[in-house]
Regions:
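Generic structural signal for residues in well-ordered beta-strands
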Residues: 6-8, 132
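Short, conserved catalytic or adaptor-binding loops enriched in Gly and charged residues
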Residues: 1-3
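Non-catalytic, surface-exposed connector residues within folded enzymatic/regulatory domains
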Residues: 31, 90-91, 146
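C-terminal "cap" of GNAT-fold acetyltransferases
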Residues: 49, 110, 117-121, 130, ...
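Conserved glycine-rich acetyl-CoA-binding loop
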Residues: 80, 84-98, 105-107, 111, ...
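Acetyl-CoA-dependent GNAT
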Residues: 10-86, 97-99, 103, 107, ...
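Residue-level detector of high-confidence beta-strand sites
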Residues: 66, 135-137
Length: 158
């Protein structure tokens, strides 16, 4: 049996329902409206997004993860990154983050920033693995439940 192959590609509007399904499956993510996703996917000049698509032996493809980020001037901000729970810790998140960092560098960003719930240790450790550092905090940044956020950043100026 052939192993499953993951392909990272630019997200399309037709992917929004699947992106929302993945996002909604994780409690720690801020849940966006469908209109927010349409606005972001229509803004190619500043916002980029990728999906991870499994190419299965049967020939069917399924989206199992996504990353959405915004580049303005020399800063790229990761808005959201998630992988379907059944594929967590499989390396797909790493592929998505690598694609976002590479695209940010290609578009002349000098650093990547993001916010993460202070209690989300798996995500914090994931970002530390990319050598993000904790640059600050935002008090009461998240709601449902109210929680502070770490601001993390990665220098990609080299």
């Amino acid at each position: 049996m052939k192993a499953l192959e993951v392909r990272i590609r630019k997200a399309r509007k037709s992917d929004i329902d699947r992106i929302i399904d993945i996002e909604r499956s994780w409690q720690h993510l801020s849940h966006w409206s469908i209109d927010s996703y349409y606005r972001l996917l229509n803004d190619d000049s500043f916002t980029s997004s990728f999906v991870a698509e499994l190419e299965e032996e049967s020939g069917s493809n399924s989206i199992v993860g996504f990353v959405i980020f915004h580049i303005a001037a020399d800063v790229s901000e990761i808005y959201n990154i998630a992988v379907e729970s059944g594929h967590a810790r499989s390396g797909i998140g790493k592929q998505l983050m690598t694609a976002a960092i590479e695209e940010s560098a290609r578009r002349k960003a000098r650093k990547v920033i993001l916010e993460v719930r202070k209690s989300n240790n798996p995500a914090i450790n994931f970002y530390l693995g990319f050598t993000f550092t904790i640059a600050g905090e935002r008090k009461n940044y998240y709601s449902n439940p109210i929680e502070d956020a770490y601001v993390m950043e990665l220098d990609i100026s080299d």
